[in-house]
Amino acid sequence: EMSASLVGSEMCIRDSLSQVETVRADLNMNPLGVPESVTKAIADNMSQLSVYPDHNTKKLKEAISAYSGAKTDDIIVGGSSYEFVKILCEFTSPKKAILITPGAQNYEKLLSMNGCEIIYYSTPEEEDFTLDIADFISKLSEDIDIIFISNPNGTTSQIIDAESLEFIAKICDGNNITMVVDEEYMDFVDDLESNSAIPLTSEYENVIVLRNTTKFFAVPGLRLAYMITSNPVLKKTLEITGLPFAIGKLVEAAGVAMFTDEKYIAESRELIRTERNLVYSALSTHKSIKLYKPAANFILIRILRDAISAGDVVDYCMPKGLYIRSCADIGGLDNKYIRFCFMNPKQDDLLVNTVLEIV
C-alpha cells in the first residue's frame, strides 16, 4: 500500500511540475519556433546527405537576395557571423578597432587574439544608450582599422537609422575603415528595409553586413549565416580560399525554405510588433523601472528600486518557469538591468505581471 501512495505522490509532484510551462524569454528567439517549412525541407532532402555540398549555393543566395534585397553576387553564405569576423580579421589584419558598449559583442576575443587594440565607445545611460552620431564620427580617425555596429543593438534593442549609418559609412570610407554592421536582430524590426545597412553595401565597399538565422527563424541548431559585401578583393580572397565554410545540402534546403516562407515571416513580424507595443505600454506606467524603447524582439529594463537587483528578479521568475536575462555581466551595464524577449500573448502577460510583482 505504501508504495502505491508513494507512486501517487510522485505523480502529483510530476503533474504540478509539468504544469509550469518553461518560457525561455532569455534566448531572444522567435516564439513561433522552427518554421514547419524548414522541418519539411530537411525531411524531404535526407537523400542529399550522400551528396557533396555545392560551393555555389545559387538557390539559397537567390532566396536570400529576394528576402533581403542584397545582390546575389554580394552574398556569402556560412555557418555563423563569428566565422565571417574571423575571416575579416585575417583579411584586414586590424590594429585598432572600435566597439560600441553596451552592445552584443562576441568579437572581442577574436580581435584580441589577432593582436588588435580595442577601443570601447560608451553610449550614456542618460541618453537612453542612443548613439551620438556627431561625437562617434569624431572618433573615427585614420588610425582606426575596423568598427563594429550591432544594429539593432543586441543588448539595448535600440536602432540607428539608415541616414546616420550612411554618415558613419562616408567617414569610414574616407578614412579607409572597415565598417561591420551586425544585423542579427534586424529581421524583427518594423521597417527593416529603411533601417538596414544592406543598401549601403553596394555603394561602399568598406561596409559589410552580417546576418544569421538563429533568432528570427528559431534555428540555433542549424548554423546558417550570411555576409553581404560588394568588396571585390574580399570576395576574390574568399573564392581563392575555397570558401572553407561552405554549408551542407540540408542546411541549404532549410535555408531556401525559410527565406521563401512568406507566411511565417509575416506572422512573426506581426506577432512581435503587437507584443512589443503591448509589453512596452503595460510596463511604461510603472515608476519603479525605466524602459528603453525597443526596436528588436526584446526589451531592456532598468530596476530603479535600491533593494532589488537583476538577480532577485531572475530568481523570482524562475520557479514560475519564466527565464529572463540578468545583464550584470554585460559591459556598460550592471546588476540593475534585466532583459527579456517578447513571446506569445499569454506568456507575455505572465512575464509582465510576474516582473511587476517584484520590481
Model regions and ranges:
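PLP-dependent enzyme catalytic core of the Aspartate aminotransferase-like
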Residues: P319-K320, G331-V359
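Single conserved hydrophobic/aromatic residue that forms the stacking wall/gate
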Residues: E1-G8, C12-I13
